């Protein structure tokens, strides 16, 4: 196995986790004020609702972990990114408290799903022998995102005047990031699961 391919794959996984965590931290750290901006909910109401839906962060680790076992890690991460892109683009125009609550719960599910999927992603790509070291390195993306995320929010809020204004910007970032799970594949393989799927469909249609 070529070392360069291993390094590129490791960097791709690191970037995938970093971007998902950055989006999650942006959202989680400002969920209550964003909910209040969008719906006009009272502070106590928004805080109580967020406290209730916070459980989806934990559930996402199990849900997306199970989904990735069935459809593959790349597809799972593509869906995690994709659902957030759609929500971050549209939620700014929604002012119904129940609907905003549902969308927020899905974002929390996606945030937890990034963590639930990445350990298996790492093991699939690099094996389990050095799992602690490999995943430990990739997990540094969490720490870096914890620094970058709040700075990103502060800059965008200064420019837009609201916390909710940061969501479409993050949606654009995640939309671009959707290329990562498409082009990333195991170091020992010649092509990724998306390319293999296209080849299979082409052969069936031929």
Question: Where is each model-derived feature located?
Answer:
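Cytoplasmic membrane-interface "Motif A"-like loop-to-helix N-cap segments
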Residues: 70-81
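Intracellular juxtamembrane helix-capping segments at the cytosolic ends
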Residues: 113-126
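Hydrophobic core of transmembrane alpha-helices in multi-pass small-molecule transporters
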Residues: 18, 99-113
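Multi-pass alpha-helical transporter architecture, strongest
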Residues: 171-206
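A membrane-interface helix-boundary motif in multi-pass transporters
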Residues: 155-172
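C-terminal ends and interior cores of transmembrane alpha-helices
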Residues: 83-95
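A late C-terminal transmembrane helix in Major Facilitator Superfamily
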Residues: 125-160
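Extracytoplasmic gate region of multi-pass secondary transporters
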Residues: 5-66, 119, 149, 153
């Amino acid at each position: 196995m070529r070392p360069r391919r291993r390094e590129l794959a490791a960097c791709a996984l690191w970037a995938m986790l970093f971007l998902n965590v950055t989006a999650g931290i942006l959202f989680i750290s400002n969920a209550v004020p964003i909910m209040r901006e969008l719906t006009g909910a009272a502070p106590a109401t928004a805080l109580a609702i967020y406290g209730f839906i916070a459980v989806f962060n934990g559930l996402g680790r199990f849900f997306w972990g199970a989904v990735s076992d069935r459809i593959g890690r790349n597809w799972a991460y593509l869906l995690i990114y994709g659902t957030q892109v759609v929500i971050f683009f549209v939620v700014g125009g929604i002012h119904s408290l129940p609907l905003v609550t549902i969308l927020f719960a899905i974002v929390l599910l996606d945030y937890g799903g990034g963590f639930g999927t990445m350990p298996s992603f790492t093991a699939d790509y690099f094996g389990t022998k050095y799992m602690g070291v490999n995943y430990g390195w990739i997990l540094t993306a969490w720490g870096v995102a914890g620094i970058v995320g709040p700075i990103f929010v502060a800059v965008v809020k200064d420019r837009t005047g609201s916390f909710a204004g940061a969501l479409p910007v993050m949606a654009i970032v995640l939309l671009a990031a959707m290329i990562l799970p498409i082009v990333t594949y195991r170091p020992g393989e010649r092509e990724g699961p998306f390319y293999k799927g296209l080849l299979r469909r082409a052969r069936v249609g031929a």
